[in-house]
Amino acid sequence: MPMLSPHSLKPDTLHLPPGTSEFLGCQRRHTLPASEFRCLTPQDAISVFEIEREAFISVSGTCPLYLDEIRHFLTLCPELSLGWFEEGRLVAFIIGSLWDKERLTQESLTLHRPGGRTAHLHVLAVHRTFRQQGKGSVLLWRYLHHLGSQPAVRRAVLMCEDALVPFYEKFGFQAVGPCAVTVGSLTFMELQCSLRCHAFLRRNSGC
């Protein structure tokens, strides 16, 4: 079998008409889906953390999940996450894990209980340039439908500050009282949502 010399592998210089390179660049960009929803992987962890850090550190001085915890959950239970990508760029995400008790505890912040029937939503965040566009609402609705398609998951639970309770109530969450979990001086309300109605809506929506 003939061998190719290094010189034969070197491409000839290609001369393109003015503007062609910009056109080809646009073509390459448009090979990516304009909008895609998918479960996250450990390879997405850095992008996730960059969005989360900007969204939470400036407001509360802390993050719901740090980078090692993000990788931990995306390794153990990627099916309980959902990311929204625009042309390959992560713009919003939710990360969850399974929990096996009636109410959240301090342990629930870092544990995944494979036998649990409750999906604990640890964090929902939107990239700063995509906020105030309704993306958080769309993503949460899709995420609850996604959970509703998993037979083992019966309900969703989260904790949030009092000001955010009305937002989550629009999606079927109900406040069950103050959360036992505290983060520094921050206190939270605990909310729960049955997934049966979301599973029914998914089956009848054709999604």
Swiss-Prot record:
It is an enzyme of class 2 (transferase). Highly expressed in pineal gland and retina. Also detected in heart and intestine. Belongs to the acetyltransferase family. AANAT subfamily. This is Serotonin N-acetyltransferase. Controls the night/day rhythm of melatonin production in the pineal gland. Catalyzes the N-acetylation of serotonin into N-acetylserotonin, the penultimate step in the synthesis of melatonin. It comes from the Eukaryota. Substrate binds at residues 124, 159. Induction: Exhibits night/day variations with an increased expression at night in the pineal gland. It catalyses: a 2-arylethylamine + acetyl-CoA = an N-acetyl-2-arylethylamine + CoA + H(+). Its main location: cytoplasm. GO terms for cellular component: perinuclear region of cytoplasm. It comes from Mesocricetus auratus. GO terms for molecular function: aralkylamine N-acetyltransferase activity.
